[in-house]
Amino acid sequence: MKEKRERVVQFLKANYKGEFVVSETPNDNGKYEVSSNGKLTLISNIEHLTSEDFVFTQVDYFNCCDSILLQTLEGAPEKARVFDCSGCISLQTLKGAPQEVEELYCISCHSLQTLKDAPQKANEFYCSYCTSLETLEGVPGMVEKFECSGCDSLKTLKGAPQKARIFNCSDCKSLQTLEYAPLEVDEFYCFDCNSLKSLENAPQQARVFDCCGCIALRTLEGSPKKVEKFICIYCTSLQSLEGAPQEANKFNCSYCPSLRTLEGAPQKTEKFDCSGCESLQTLKGGPGEAKWFYCSGCTSLQSLEGAPEEVEVFDCNNCQSLKSLNGAPKEAIIFDCSNCSSLESLIGVPKKVEKFYCTGWESPKYLESAPQKMEEFDCRKAYGKKNL
């Protein structure tokens, strides 16, 4: 009996790293029970997680990453808080994974073809950067946080967990439609998607929606209408904001090299950001009631016409094309036009501004019409200034 237990101990020491406890006597099936309150990591390439002499019962964090021979999860712990089988190139099914796991990771798996037999009680599930998975069928239906970002093979969201609170399918190179996306999700991320052409079937109840960095998305039609925070920065294909959610509290379409007009921008958003835009020539159609407005770093903006008039914070610093402040918001409390290389005059500056920044100017010669009641005024490094 002692020899059998010693074989179990030696097997674990040879193939696993971490602390573990082996029962003193075998169970009714004649096998020793092994548990761990810490992290137990598989460190050798073996075809089976256990030997015929023992079983895993409960492990806090079980890690069998990067195994190149493991074809089955049979013998995995019955219960685990975290279960990680990422990087496996031989595993084709999740059968045998602990059913009561809280967090499950199978990231960068190149052999997993189905999520059937996945543990249905997982709170968090990650199958990111999978090159073999074509469908989400089998995903735990009640999972709260689900991530399948960077998937090279996923063609449909069929089987996606409909009750997920956070859903991330970003950096997907094969997904063309959001059909079957979880409808009641709170936060939805599909940024850096190289294949998504339409937001049709996007979840309409999302509080946060992020589709930034999309190189295929041409329209915002189908975007969630009641979203609070909407992000589509670095989108290289978006030409119009038509279809944008009109009730978003925060809207960010900065660094878009293709957007030429703000027509369709949500009018009642509180915080609007179109900074770094390389194609925007006018603010016409911009949100008229925004409290914070950022158009800094614009290389194409020539006029502030259309800027929200009652904005509190206005930022157009590092603007390389703006020549005049005519049309600038009149009620701004904070106004920043520092490092503007093209601005020639301060005519049009808001008169009630409290904090005004025009540091780093190289072109202005006069500060005519400068604000008179400000608390802070900074025009350091204004090399071309000759007259105050």
What are these language model-derived features?
Residues N387-L388:
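Ankyrin-repeat-protein effector appendages
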